[in-house]
Amino acid sequence: MSNHECNREEHSWQELKADALADDFCQGITHYICDKVYKPLGVAERLLQHPEERLTASAVIYSRARQEVWMVGDCQALIGGKLYENGKPYEQEIAEKRVDLIKEGMLPAEARRQIEPLLVEAMLSGQNKTYTVIDGFPIYREGVKVVSVSSSETVSASSEIVLASDGYAFLKPTLAESEEALANQIANDPQNISSFIATKGLVEGNKSFDDRTYIRFLP
């Protein structure tokens, strides 16, 4: 598979084995999106030039066979109480630009519109080149974080693992604590310009500023 082209061969996502490597997952999910979405729609060539239009996702996966956590894209994990993150490298700078605009008096909706060209530019120059995302094109492997659970000094037999999306501003050991921290963030800093800096804040009609997924288990 080329470093720049959508895969042209059929691939069965169901063939991924229990002892698969993180690279196997990355290749498998990329092939699946290309085969099942882009190729049937005839959009692969256009999306090659327009990464801002691609289907995009992140994933954080626990491999029981390999005792590893794979962080593919913008996600987070607590392993033995230690926080691991894998954010986009450009987001902090753009988020701070949005904060400055709002503090100067600009309405949050307009501040978001002002930074959107910067977000698109970052996608054009960096998506699966300087940071990792699942988008149906070859995944930037250097941006995939693999955490060995078995060799981690902080993990014991009774240690829990938490995997979550980036929708939790402050990831905690339990769902209740994480939801409480998020509720406090929304109540005290709904536009994410102070205690937590982000490229977007709470939009009217929404319950939070981003999607959220949370799972906690014993390895």
Sequence positions of predicted segments:
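PP2C/PPM-type serine/threonine phosphatase catalytic domain
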Residues: 1-219
